[in-house]
UniProtKB/Swiss-Prot annotation:
GO BP terms in the entry: fructose 1,6-bisphosphate metabolic process; fructose 6-phosphate metabolic process; fructose metabolic process; gluconeogenesis; reductive pentose-phosphate cycle; sucrose biosynthetic process
Subunit architecture: Homodimer.
EC number: 3.1.3.37
Enzyme class (EC, first level): hydrolase
Protein name (record): Sedoheptulose-1,7-bisphosphatase, chloroplastic
Catalyzed reactions per annotation: D-sedoheptulose 1,7-bisphosphate + H2O = D-sedoheptulose 7-phosphate + phosphate
Amino acid sequence: METSMACCSRSIVLPRVSPQHSSALVPSSINLKSLKSSSLFGESLRMTTKSSVRVNKAKNSSLVTKCELGDSLEEFLAKATTDKGLIRLMMCMGEALRTIGFKVRTASCGGTQCVNTFGDEQLAIDVLADKLLFEALNYSHFCKYACSEELPELQDMGGPVDGGFSVAFDPLDGSSIVDTNFSVGTIFGVWPGDKLTGVTGRDQVAAAMGIYGPRTTYVLALKDYPGTHEFLLLDEGKWQHVKETTEINEGKLFCPGNLRATSDNADYAKLIQYYIKEKYTLRYTGGMVPDVNQIIVKEKGIFTNVISPTAKAKLRLLFEVAPLGFLIEKAGGHSSEGTKSVLDIEVKNLDDRTQVAYGSLNEIIRFEKTLYGSSRLEEPVPVGAAA
């Protein structure tokens, strides 16, 4: 593990942190003793005496440099935002994703025989991923509060309220299929300030997912920069910008989750039958991250996870649905919980759950009309004198 950590920190330069933030602590509930000898965010990360992030700005502080394919993660972020705190946080999370990707490839899949607050069994790799992400947020010095699906309580990370962020994450979505060698991933959303309740997904300033499969990728979007962007982990341990998605087109690809709901949700059964009749390509792995990511990569398709009287909502709004909704909508797609975008749902409790669909415009219109009779996205037909 020490070797993997060391290789991750090679040639990484992060923006300077104000000394006033140097005392931030990882929450006491996070035991990092096992990581002490090979800390990912310790002295091995080279800190500069000057900020390494140079952003070209006009007088009104608008960005004047366009990001390009081939940019490193640091180069991309320096061009995409003037917020050095956000740059640092996203860089630190990138370091954590890199290490989690290595551990997923080499992990033992034995269970720890423990469960989280929600009752889900945690695997050893879940626990490690959780620790690494909390450590990354602590080391960023710009995270005020954080919580995870495995530790669903606000943890004070010691960062500032003004100019700082609060982060919610699912450390390893799909950990139960690691042993099958399917792709799995990490999801996180970034909100400004110190609030993770009383907010909506549209309030996010950034969201991202890490995908650990044949390739390790870091897919992110920023509120003030167009598109959703994919970074590939190269052999030398650097993230390289390889894809920009700004449009989700129409195409016959479907990814239906929670199919047991079709037994007592006739409208969902009708929708699934439509996909089959129209000869859609079925691509579903059971891992939400790769299943949603394919819509961004292929630039087409639909993902659904629908509820019924006996198949209740399982997907968590804060940790999964809102961050992925942000990525999809920044990519030019749409999201829905049936009557509105998932980004417009207020997070009232950390454990709020919902049904969801992500996809192209026409697919989301079809989803809403089939399940609820009408769609907010469909343009009204002119009548009377307006016709």
